[in-house]
């Protein structure tokens, strides 16, 4: 979900190659408390700009023959796009379980998912579309188009939450050091340990958790607490 629009001017510039990143607009909703916007937590935007190419111009450019083909040599205007990424709250009813009777061809119980979005996520999408349009309007964009595709679980995520951290072994798989409560010499440091990553990319957090867990494991090994 998000919006895009035409940015007038800058026709003397053209992109060559691709940069390794686009632009990012950090979360601004509910940062210092409840903003009264009808939902908790928030969202951020990823985005970028590009000049419209011939593959899009060919369907909107009038003409025929050589004149028409020559007109496609000139790239179209710059277009700015903003795509929103919101947090999915860690609902207890969203689960991953092992099936009680069904097994795969190796005899291992099949994974069974139960997942659905809540009203909080739907409100995120409504608001982030409105705000994307407002930002593009404030930037002077024209021909603004908003979009909100159907919400599909797993379409743009980092999988997490299947072995969450917690102090109580009855409520969590891991302790605060990413160590399995029921197996002291086993550590889990990927996204399974986190029940939410806010609305940002958690990859660096995974790396930090892994470094911390490895350091703790070495300390425990040297102390003879684990083998």
Residue ranges of each PLM-predicted region?
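Mid-to-C-terminal "cap/lid" subdomains and adjacent gly/pro-rich loops that border
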Residues: 1-80, 84, 222-227
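A glycine-rich dinucleotide-binding beta-alpha-beta segment and adjacent secondary-structure elements
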Residues: 75-88, 93, 108-119, 123-196, ...
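Composition- and surface-driven signal marking solvent-exposed, interaction-prone regions
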Residues: 19-20, 97, 175, 200-201
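Loop/helix patches that line or flank the sugar-binding groove of alpha-linked glycan CAZymes
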Residues: 95-99, 103-107
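Internal hydrophobic alpha-helix adjacent to the cofactor/substrate pocket in enzyme cavities
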Residues: 132-142, 209-226
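A conserved FAD-binding loop/helix module that cradles the flavin
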Residues: 196-215
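Generic structural motif
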Residues: 8-10, 28-31, 85-89, 101-103, ...
């Amino acid at each position: 979900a998000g919006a895009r629009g035409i940015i007038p001017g800058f026709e003397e510039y053209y992109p060559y190659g691709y940069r390794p990143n686009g632009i990012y607009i950090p979360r601004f909703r509910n940062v210092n408390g409840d903003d009264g916007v009808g939902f908790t937590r928030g969202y951020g935007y990823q985005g970028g700009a590009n000049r419209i190419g011939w593959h899009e111009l060919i369907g909107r450019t009038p003409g025929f023959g050589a004149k028409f083909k020559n007109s496609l040599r000139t790239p179209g205007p710059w277009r700015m796009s903003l795509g929103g990424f919101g947090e999915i709250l860690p609902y207890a009813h969203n689960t991953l379980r092992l099936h009680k009777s069904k097994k795969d061809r190796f005899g291992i119980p099949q994974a069974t998912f139960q997942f659905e979005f809540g009203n909080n996520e739907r409100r995120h999408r409504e608001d982030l579309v409105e705000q994307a349009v407002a930002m593009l309007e404030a930037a002077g964009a024209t021909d603004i188009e908003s979009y909100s595709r159907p919400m599909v679980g797993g379409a743009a995520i980092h999988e997490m939450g299947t072995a969450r951290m917690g102090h109580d072994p009855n409520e969590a798989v891991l302790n605060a050091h990413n160590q399995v409560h029921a197996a002291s010499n086993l550590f889990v440091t990927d996204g399974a340990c986190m029940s939410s990553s806010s609305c940002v990319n958690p990859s660096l957090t995974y790396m930090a958790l892994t470094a911390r867990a490895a350091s703790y494991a070495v300390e425990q090994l040297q102390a003879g607490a684990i083998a």
